[in-house]
Amino acid sequence: MFPSFPPGISGDEFNLLFYGYQSQEEIRALLQNLSLAVSNTALELPSGRKLPLRLSGGVSWYPENSTDLSTLKKYADFAMYQVKKAEKGYITEFDLELFTKNAKETEMRRLFHRMLNEELFTYYFQPIVSAADGSIYAYEALMRGNLPALTRPDQILQLAHEEECLHEIERLTMFLSAKSYATFLSTHQIRGDELLFVNSIASQYMNHDESVAY
């Protein structure tokens, strides 16, 4: 028996509600047969070329995953998109652990973009001491994030790589470390003749306009 709510989601996506069965295994067998039937079907295009069909789907279970219909739909939708992200053409069941992990990753990405937009970085200056006389002749600028969940440079750089924001990290590092140097100089925390070493991303050097502004 199918569905008691509108099946269409968008485009080629649909909801199906299976109920009245004695076990999950019965439904799994039906889904397997449905997937097989679709995979054995092809659409013939006007050119005569045949386009094979594949079925990608996600399954959530009542009451194991949730007793709320909208939540069950959301969980099934999440499972389906995991299929589409990996290898299309099969049906998978909702995984709460994967869903929780994905939610955490989404939140970390949101925090990362907030960090970029609001420039929430601090650059600590690690002194470099001369072996000859013990004086400080340079500082190395060490980046730290200002959000509790996102402080370590390796976390920040990994997210920057995944979100294709390495250039923005490079630009901010150059400008904000120089700004920190100027602040320390104006407050007499450094002499002003020390060198400043900055860890740069070799493939992400500043463009002409950024270099002029710097």
Predicted ranges, named:
Residues 1-24:
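Conserved helix-loop-beta segment at the catalytic/binding core of cyclic-nucleotide signaling proteins
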Residues 104-161, 199:
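Active-site core of bacterial EAL-family cyclic-dinucleotide phosphodiesterase domains
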Residues 7-9, 38-55, 84, 185-194:
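Catalytic core regions of nucleotide second-messenger enzymes
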Residues 135-137, 166-214:
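Catalytic core of bacterial c-di-GMP phosphodiesterases, primarily the EAL and HD-GYP domains
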Residues 73-95, 111-122, 146-150:
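Catalytic/regulatory signature loops of cyclic-dinucleotide turnover enzymes
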Residues 17-27, 46-50, 54-72, 97-100, ...:
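Catalytic strand-loop-helix junctions within cyclic-nucleotide turnover domains
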Residues 63, 82-107, 191-200:
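Flexible, glycine/charge-rich interdomain/linker segments that couple
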Residues 28, 47, 62-88, 154, ...:
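Catalytic-core segments of nucleotide cyclases and related cyclic-nucleotide turnover enzymes
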